[in-house]
Amino acid sequence: CGTTGVIVSAHTSLCAAPIYENGTPEQKAKYLPKLCSGEWLGAFGLTEPGAGTDAQGQQTIAKEDGDYWVLNGSKIFITNAGFADVFIVIAVTDNVLDKRGRPTKLCSAFIVERTDPGFSVGKAEDKMGIRGSSTCELIFEDCRIPKDRMLGVRGKGFQLAMATLDGGRIGIASQALGIAEGALEETIAYVK
């Protein structure tokens, strides 16, 4: 079923894979066993209202506060959000000047847990298809996460996100092809 494919693809390629590929040994030990066993479900938060996946349009920010990162902002259209336990989230951590002296935003990736203070899942989307898959917004209101939950290198979150999406596209393309083949087979059987 299409829904199962989307849930599993988002879970494995968009949440577990970036932890496997970029996580510290401690992050891998904490998250991968529960994600791989299915005890925990994962999601990936990049898309924002008014910005989509444009790195320079990102409004979700993460500021250092002692031993914590404090996240503020929101994400939309997040697959698995209604039921996920772990989220990979992209947020702006640095505003710098590029080589030409223009202001630019550097994003970083973070591991957010459903129970983190200041984090909540917003409204569910009323979708036309793949309705069994939960798609919701993520809300960060002074969401405090320990500093050791940064995933990968500071300021390289956009690169991490793009590499992650490359892997996710394979799963979604495979699903689309399978659904199209199934629809064609059913159509041929019907018209005979």
Predicted regions mapped to residue ranges:
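Internal helix-loop-helix
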Residues: 1-29, 33-39, 79-86
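A short, Trp-centered hydrophobic/proline-enriched beta-strand micro-motif
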Residues: 38-46
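Cysteine-centered functional microenvironments
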Residues: 45-49, 72
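Short Gly/Pro-enriched turn/cap motifs at secondary-structure boundaries
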Residues: 50-53, 77-80, 100-102, 127-134
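A structural signal for short hydrophobic beta-strand segments in well-ordered beta-sheet cores
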Residues: 60-63
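A short core secondary-structure module
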Residues: 72-121
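Glycine-rich beta->alpha junctions and the first turn(s) of the following alpha-helix
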Residues: 119-192
